[in-house]
């Protein structure tokens, strides 16, 4: 149930709150409890900082229907992520302990707690803050004081809600949880009320819990001995440049593209120079075409000091494109790290000189001169 004046829609504002947190703090392991249709997970998979993304929900049918929205697209294979990403979907209850959700940087519970019975809520806080104990927890829940602005709302906003708290009740619960489990909590929200109803507060109230301690390895190891109870609905590893086959493919794509650019530019300048010299040379059929150096200016390559060893050159009918020239491309350097890696990754896809320091291209001098 949402009012028309929420722009963007309230659910998007809740997701944006989480995304802003991710932008700021760069968590590597993120889980969404009560993930339902996986909409938040679908959005977060595009953040390079996240390496592990987990969704947990009690409804296996919904997870099975929506899991395909989290599988890699063709674009993910064409342009792999810089960092690894593993996505897991589990069917299970938020009141159950399972080692699969240990060691997380951020766990979100968006509009979840109001669906829990009182006993479940008590177990939930023990499982989340005592067992899972992530560095940060973001919990959102409806603000009951806002309901007077919903004309058709005579009870709770959703038939499955077991309760809806006002601001005082939510703050009291959050403060008690923070004190009990050694967290700091800040209360905020999304969904601004109309100007004439500011006194009701946000439509969705949000608590951000931050852990005040560092969990020991011994504590984690003890928890890891807990029996697994969640059912895996999806396990997928996204293609990334951390895998050699994807890194090699990316290096070849970038490096050989620039090598081909250098070759094309060389021939263009070569032909242009020949055409300029033609009126002044009566013996055009026997002009030497050897040892021509390229002095080009590349918009896509960095402008560095002149270095003879980096310049392409012709030797008989072979064009030599030094690997130093290719390695000077920022993206190539970023991907490879050093010249040896560049040489290794293009071997087999390009013809290299005997010393392995240049890419070779056969040039048809008869048609070029």
Swiss-Prot record:
Cited InterPro entries: Hen1, SAM-dependent_MTases_sf
Compartment annotation: Cytoplasm
Cofactor binding description: Binds 1 Mg(2+) ion per subunit.
Keywords: Cytoplasm, Magnesium, Metal-binding, Methyltransferase, RNA-binding, RNA-mediated gene silencing, S-adenosyl-L-methionine, Transferase
PANTHER family documented for this protein: HEN1, SMALL RNA 2'-O-METHYLTRANSFERASE
Entry's family note: Belongs to the methyltransferase superfamily. HEN1 family.
The name this protein goes by in its record: Small RNA 2'-O-methyltransferase
Organism listed in the record: Xenopus tropicalis (Western clawed frog)
């Amino acid at each position: 149930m949402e009012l028309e004046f929420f722009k963007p829609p309230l659910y998007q504002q809740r997701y944006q709150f989480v995304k802003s947190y991710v932008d700021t703090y760069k968590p590597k392991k993120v889980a969404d409890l009560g993930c339902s249709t996986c909409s938040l997970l679908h959005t977060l998979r595009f953040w390079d900082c996240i390496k592990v993304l987990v969704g947990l929900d009690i409804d296996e049918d919904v997870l099975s229907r929506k899991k395909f929205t989290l599988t890699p697209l063709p674009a993910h294979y064409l342009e792999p992520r810089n960092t690894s990403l593993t996505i897991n979907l589990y069917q299970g209850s938020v009141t159950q302990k399972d080692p699969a959700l240990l060691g997380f940087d951020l766990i979100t519970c968006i509009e979840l707690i109001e669906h829990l019975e009182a006993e479940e809520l008590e177990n939930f806080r023990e499982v989340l803050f005592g067992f899972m104990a992530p560095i940060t927890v973001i919990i959102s829940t409806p603000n009951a004081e806002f309901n007077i602005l919903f004309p058709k709302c005579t009870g709770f906003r959703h038939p499955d809600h077991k309760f809806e708290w006002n601001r005082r009740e939510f703050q009291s619960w959050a403060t008690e949880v923070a004190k009990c489990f050694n967290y700091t909590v800040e209360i905020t929200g999304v969904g601004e009320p109309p100007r004439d109803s500011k006194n009701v507060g946000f439509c969705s109230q949000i608590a951000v819990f931050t852990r005040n301690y560092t969990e020991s390895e011994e504590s984690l190891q003890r928890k890891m001995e807990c029996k697994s109870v969640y059912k895996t609905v999806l396990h997928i590893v996204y293609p990334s440049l951390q895998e050699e086959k994807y890194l090699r493919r990316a290096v070849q794509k970038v490096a050989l593209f620039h090598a081909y650019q250098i070759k094309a530019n060389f021939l263009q300048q070569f032909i242009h120079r020949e055409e300029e010299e033609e009126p002044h040379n009566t013996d055009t059929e026997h002009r030497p075409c050897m040892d021509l150096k390229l002095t080009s200016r590349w918009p896509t390559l960095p402008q560095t000091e002149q270095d003879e060893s980096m310049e392409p050159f012709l030797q008989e009918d072979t064009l030599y494109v030094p690997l130093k020239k290719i390695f000077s491309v920022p993206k190539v350097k970023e991907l490879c790290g050093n010249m040896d890696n560049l040489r290794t990754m293009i071997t087999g896809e390009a013809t290299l000189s005997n010393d392995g320091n240049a890419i070779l291209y056969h040039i048809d001098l008869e048609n070029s001169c």
